[in-house]
């Protein structure tokens, strides 16, 4: 959405505003403040939308910054939208755009982490209270007080509440559905970083396989690009249209195909043929097992997870391991024993991986989940594994699809990467309408429009476990993904605490 924003800071008691209902509404908004919530005495007035900041302090160490955008009463559509953050928070995502386009009251939060991920704050130890804020509390309280502010400003409750977010924001959406099912009627969680313990295993394994014991990188960016491209070429004669030769139709590959594309990579770049390097590469894609239990499936073939030579993966997001690098109190995980300790200590807090969505389902909640088949940061096998386990609990994909649907987007990478088809959140305002229609009109989304700009093509991605492809005439068809290939994490490595 194109953003045009002219902002004026307005103080209480200052110059009068042109918004007719602002003064009375803001006086009511100020009354929302209590021992936890402090509403700012100043606002940002952009065109005819008011941006109100409020701070939440549920415990002494907490400092949760929030912002809500309030359209004028005559333009409010009656909806409340929560907006997710990215990475480890610390900044306020924009809320003006969505309010301006659809007319919703729109709120977000910095997750209470701003002082700990910037500058000197990164050297501080993070109190447990702030970890709770980041994991679940900031989003929940932002929602509670955001709705109260909307009601105070407009004189009535929102008729529906929705949430959308990607990566960290996708995790926030999962946490809301699992921990606070009454907060939202509909949630769109894209590329969710919701399985911190599993992502930690993937990234710890990735680091160990691509670095020596002194932390020196063993692969160049060019070598890893060859490895990322090899599966596309290896599968081009078996993949259907329109994917063949461009992206993988299905990156959940069996061991024989992993061996095949690694052999092709070594042929393309003979420097990769070293037996130790080939062993390390295979370990990246085959995942990790300990004591007979699977920790993670492995990284996705076709996804590019390159880095500058000599630089580690310390800045990668989405895992327990990297949170300590960002001073969120976890510390550098150096061994698999350390990893096990971290899982036991904080895994249940940081994960949003429960398969108990009874309360969310029973009150009519709807959850749309997106994952990307080239996601290099929150690898999608964990999301697919969770959805398969969820479907087993609720009697199959059909019954589960009555309240939760997963759409796997071919060629889609995480923000910060470069997907062969698309990169980032994977949604637009039009995509948000799919969620609203499901909640308000009971029209479940039978497909998710996935835009392939370079081919001027829109892929009608069906709900998992179906994939779509084109026949020789260019007509879209569907078939099921192969079963039994995904290496699911053992449930013991996916702990979940409802409220920690």
Specify the residue positions occupied by each region the protein language model found.
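Sec/Tat signal peptide C-region and signal peptidase I cleavage site
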Residues: 15-19
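C-terminal His-loop and adjacent cap/lid subdomain of alpha/beta-hydrolase
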Residues: 20-500
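Sec-dependent N-terminal signal peptides
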Residues: 4-13
